[in-house]
């Protein structure tokens, strides 16, 4: 299955990578690579993450304390949000 990003998720991904890169040179690159690694896992085994909400699965990324929120559609896996665990998940709805 192919992966698609919602506009919001893509923006969160880019902004988070920039934030980490601004903190420590190279950390943004490590963040992006970790997200890509997790997206590969999702792509190869879409049902591996916990079904948390009605149709949204959540994969926890412990290295950076982020979660990837996604849903499985007919032809795509849609990344709905890439969310830092310190944020209120109610804002996703």
Over which residues does each language-model region extend?
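Short gly/ser/thr-rich secondary-structure transition/capping motifs
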Residues: 51, 61-62
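Basic, Lys/Arg-enriched alpha-helical interface segments
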Residues: 2-56, 76
């Amino acid at each position: 299955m192919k992966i698609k990003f919602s506009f919001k998720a893509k923006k969160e991904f880019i902004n988070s990578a920039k934030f980490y890169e601004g903190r420590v040179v190279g950390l943004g690159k490590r963040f992006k690579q970790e997200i890509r690694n997790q997206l590969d896992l999702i792509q190869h085994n879409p049902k591996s993450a916990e079904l948390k909400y009605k149709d949204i699965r959540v994969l926890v990324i412990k290295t950076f304390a982020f979660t990837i929120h996604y849903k499985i559609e007919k032809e795509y896996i849609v990344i709905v949000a890439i969310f830092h665990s310190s944020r209120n998940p109610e804002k996703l709805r």
